[in-house]
Amino acid sequence: SIGYYEVKKKPMCYAGGDINAPCWYHQYSFARDVFANYIITALWLKDELSEQELKIVDKYINKMYKKFLEPTELHKEEQGFYQFANGGLAILVYASWTNNKKLAAEEINHRFKEMDRLFYEDGYINNNSFRGVKAQWYHSMGLDIALGYVYIADLWGAETPKKLHNKLVRASEVVNLAIADWDKFTSRKYSGTQHNKISSKDSARMHTSHMAFALDTLMKIVTGVELEHDAVYLQKRTYHMKDGIDESIGFNPNCID
């Protein structure tokens, strides 16, 4: 699979709004996220591994970390909030595997600042909320990932800044706005460059992201906001519930005790 340094040399996804354009970044991010889930599995099995097995797994994890994640440590993402918190959750998983509290602290501080920059005061998300006919889907996905990150950061002992928390509350309210009034939701204009905005109605996803199958749970836990009734979302999310975990954050929020 393509590594981080190689993917930076490739064209952006949906170049020129072409939905058929090759998306090299997806190949990289999917491989990165599979690797993150590999570490999560290794963490669960760590106490069951023999000394030789642990040595092999640890060597592989360190090798893959250098390829997919080490180059992104403290990297400033200019647009959007996507899978595994732009890789931040994967870095926290690695920090857990290596028991590197310093790395975890640096990552959380960096990611909170990034989230504060990418989440606007009114709750809209840079890039995510302005994806044309997929805006609702990507906004709710971005919020799901942000809430998942905040929940995990809390387990590390981090306190979410009040300003960021307020933005997440508003972002939750924007999820509900998109459900209740699509036109009002999309009336918010975006002043930046949007290379991945999709206008084709054939590609429309005018519903809450069904991949975020426990968004209602995370919203209630982290922000206290109740998710509005979205019939399409409730029907479609059943497919991803069978996956067992939310693949964008690496765990199942419905299993939170």
What kind of region is each of these model predictions?
Residues 1-161, 165:
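Aromatic-lined, polymer-binding surfaces characteristic
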Residues 74-82, 101, 178-185, 252-255:
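Glycan-recognition and catalytic cores of secretory/periplasmic carbohydrate-active enzymes
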Residues 152, 156, 170-174, 181, ...:
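Terminal, non-catalytic domain-edge segments
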